[in-house]
Structures are given as structure tokens and as C-alpha cells.
């Protein structure tokens, strides 16, 4: 195998509850891949990232329920996940936390880059909001009027939020999929994925700060905070230098990479 950088990352678990066996499976799988490539390429060519997702409505509610400040609450559960990794002898290179100032700064840089490309706009929106999912659900996603995952009736909310023009990427994503048919196994699932991509809609990426004070403030708009998924997903590039160390970023991204995700 030729020498190359291998970047391995798990998803970032939410810190609204204790670690569980599903997290262990993901951490251990990623650790096994990391160890394998270290034997082939050496430690210097492998970077293994784990961490915790620490913003959003569920965390805000849970901290209030436990009578803790938000910072104390996320510190407590981030440490639980660190201890959990230690329990399973998971040897990561970086434990990434989305509540840190460094993450906030990098996420804001990412927002501004999206804005400069014309991918962000603001509009009034009304929809069915599931607190458990922390997102708006469409009519066709509901089962008997309820969220299929949380079995609750979504709240009807009306807000002015920022949206990401995800619909602009239907064409490029379909083209990429056509050119990389070995991306998905089994190939019989490609038509299903094509259908999902063809139906992509723009997504809400902010929330009113008066309703959710625990989040990253949107650049140049103190009344809005990042929607938790939009800020958390930037961790994968932030962890290897986006917004802070462009030289390091160029060494690890884009590279031959593994994203290990078990849900």
C-alpha cells in the first residue's frame, strides 16, 4: 500500500444522555480501522477523530432538567464519553467538542463561505417541528400525524430562519453518483438514492435565539443561532485545520478517508 494520509472519524454523539452500546460499536469499529492503518502506514499518516455534539434544544432542555448550567452540563457528559472510550481502550488522536471557541470560530467561517457562494438565504417558514429530531418534518414523513421515531405530535412553529440552498446540489450530486457507481453497495440501492437526491429540498439552518439561546450566533445576525446539525457537521473539516491551519487542512482534506458511522 502506498503511503497516504488516512483520516478516520466517527460521528459526534449528542451529550443529552449517557453513552450506550451503540456508541461503543461505532468507537470500537473506528478504532480497529485506525489500528490497522497505523500498522500499514505508521502513526504519522493516520488521524482518528472522535468527539461530542454539544448544542441544540435537547441539550438545553436536559441541562435545565438536571439543574446545571449549560457549560457544566456539556462538560459533564463530554467527560462521560471520554471515560467511555477509555473503558473500551479506544485510542483516538483528537477529541473534538462543538462548544469550544475554536469550533465556534471555524463554523462561522464556514457559514460565511456558504453565504459568499449564494447558498444561504432568509425566509419566513411554518412547519411541523419535532423537538426529539430537532428538525421540521414533512407531511409524508409523519405516521398517523406523529414523528415515526419519537411517537410524538410535532409542534406547529412559525419562524424567520436562514436556509441552505441544498436544491442547488441535486444535479452535481446525481452526476457524481453516475460517475462513481461503486460508491454504494449493493448497487441495487442506487435507484433509491437517486430518488432521494432528486427530491432534495432547501433546509433550515438557523433558529431564533430567543427560543434557543444555546447555539452558535449567526454572523452579523445576533437574533439567530446555527441549527445544531449545520454547526456540528463542520467538525469533520474543523478537526483537521479548517479555519485555523490551512497547511494542515491541505494534508488531510481531501484525502483517502474513512467515515465510520453506525446508527
Residue ranges with predicted function:
Residues 1-43, 47-50, 102-106, 157-263:
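Structured secondary-structure scaffolds
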Residues 52-58:
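Short, charge-patterned binding micro-sites
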Residues 59-66:
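Glycine-rich loop at the start of a catalytic domain that most often binds anionic cofactors/ligands
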Residues 66-216:
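Residue patterns forming the tRNA-binding/recognition surfaces of aminoacyl-tRNA synthetases
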Amino acid at each position: 500500500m502506498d503511503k497516504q494520509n488516512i483520516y478516520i472519524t466517527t460521528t459526534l454523539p449528542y451529550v443529552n444522555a449517557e453513552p450506550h452500546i451503540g456508541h461503543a460499536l461505532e468507537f470500537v469499529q473506528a478504532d480497529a480501522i485506525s489500528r490497522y492503518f497505523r500498522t500499514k502506514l505508521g502513526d504519522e499518516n493516520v488521524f482518528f477523530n472522535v468527539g461530542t455534539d454539544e448544542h441544540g434544544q435537547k441539550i438545553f432542555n436536559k441541562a435545565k432538567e438536571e439543574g446545571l448550567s449549560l457549560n457544566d452540563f456539556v462538560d459533564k457528559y463530554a467527560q462521560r464519553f471520554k471515560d467511555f472510550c477509555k473503558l473500551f481502550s479506544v485510542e483516538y488522536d483528537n477529541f473534538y467538542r462543538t462548544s469550544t471557541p475554536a469550533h465556534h470560530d471555524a463554523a462561522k467561517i464556514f457559514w460565511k463561505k456558504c453565504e459568499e457562494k449564494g447558498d444561504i438565504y432568509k425566509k419566513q417558514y411554518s412547519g411541523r417541528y419535532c423537538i426529539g429530531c430537532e428538525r421540521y418534518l414533512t407531511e409524508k414523513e409523519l405516521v398517523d400525524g406523529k414523528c415515526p421515531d419519537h411517537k410524538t405530535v410535532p409542534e406547529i412553529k412559525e419562524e424567520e430562519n436562514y436556509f441552505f440552498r441544498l436544491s442547488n446540489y441535486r444535479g452535481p450530486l446525481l452526476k457524481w453518483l453516475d460517475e462513481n457507481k461503486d460508491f454504494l453497495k449493493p448497487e441495487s440501492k442506487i435507484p433509491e438514492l437517486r430518488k432521494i437526491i432528486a427530491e432534495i429540498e432547501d433546509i433550515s439552518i438557523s433558529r431564533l435565539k430567543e427560543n434557543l439561546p444555546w447555539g452558535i450566533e449567526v454572523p452579523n445576525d445576533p437574533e439567530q443561532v446555527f441549527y445544531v446539525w449545520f454547526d456540528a457537521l463542520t467538525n469533520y473539516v474543523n478537526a483537521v485545520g479548517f479555519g485555523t491551519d490551512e497547511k494542515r487542512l491541505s494534508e488531510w482534506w481531501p484525502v483517502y478517508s474513512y467515515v465510520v458511522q453506525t446508527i
